[in-house]
């Protein structure tokens, strides 16, 4: 790549190039918008009418508790639970009776268990003991029951042997039964075996489940139609937000000014929409989409293109946080720096306009500085040849992975609670933030370490673990996969122990972890977004659901 294209970048420096592919979307999201709501007041009226019908179904008193549990679960899985948060909480509190399960079959017990644990209610896994035979083994051949049991096992915490047995039992049975199943159950099972619901991006899970539920003979027509209309209405909002972000990206002309970096504004929006899709979080989504865009540019500059001297100058400029500092960094970096300052200034103005104050913008700036410092350390690893210990690498990578930053910035953008106390607590990297960050790092490194080594990088969780503990590459990768499961159990545990302050961090921690699970399930789906990532973005942001 010609250094001359990048302004004052030195032409005699041997620079690396990751050869990232261009955007797969071109200007599509700059011009594309849904016409679903155009001049169609009847759709809005129908949506409101159906919402009331579904609410009535949810709150009506009934002695048929299995049906009420199933309905509550379907509302959530169809992606419309955010309309009924108060009603769902009330229903779950009623269902949180430890004796109720004595009358449930295994299918209902599994759904009940997953629902309650998934919403922070403490339920013992002992509820599954009565479904084991005299030999201590589970007994069922029913595919739907096995599917529900398998989904429930992913809410397990450390030490729950019965759920470890249940996941092995149900997975083995489902894999054997899958070829014999018909639609829609076969797709439900296939999706769960690929990515269980608890670990899936909730918006993507809803997109998958809507046509599956629509094909069920026992479906509720009003609920099915409501889910379709609501999905399309939300999609129209998300398209408008992405169009605005694409316009900002285009105005700065990042792709042509920084051709070594990933051009991934749509993928970044998909990431942030996966973390919080609800309309009330529009401001947070817009801000975080720009943040992930600018952070990605900085990451690529430090990882791939910049010299150690150049990135050190940029780090110093970030510490100053002053437009005057732009004069002290290489010309090619200046567009990143001015873009960065502009994002935070715009966010501050929007917070003041929306809420009357800037809602702890200083926390946002500090956590951004922190991630740049972590990038600096990683650049020093590469340029000096320094190999950190495994613990030293992981301590820095918890920050460089970005999840602490994204969680704190999401909290500021959402602004739903006593923010300063929550931010003080979240800034200490509590257990749930640490678990989320570690899962992200293990997943990321497993999928990217070989590509990074082709660029000359030798520091990763895999390589540091191999070096320190004297194990093979295969053994190190196996250990990383085991650690992902351990940290998921720890993350699950923290959701059950959450107090008033930490409960506000539960959903961001879970959702960012879910996005990473999905984005990297078939490789680095952010850097290489030409395959399944493109398909998923199209499903969520391009193709409406047929009514």
From Swiss-Prot:
Induction: Up-regulated by methyl jasmonate.
Binding site for Mg(2+) 2: 299, 303
CC cofactor note: Binds 3 Mg(2+) ions per subunit.
EC number(s) from the headed UniProt entry: 4.2.3.87, 4.2.3.93
A matching Pfam family: Terpene_synth
Top-level taxon in the UniProt lineage: Eukaryota
Cofactor(s) needed: Mg(2+)
Keywords, in A-Z order: Lyase, Magnesium, Metal-binding
Comment, domains: The Asp-Asp-Xaa-Xaa-Asp/Glu (DDXXD/E) motif is important for the catalytic activity, presumably through binding to Mg(2+).
Protein name: Delta-guaiene synthase 1
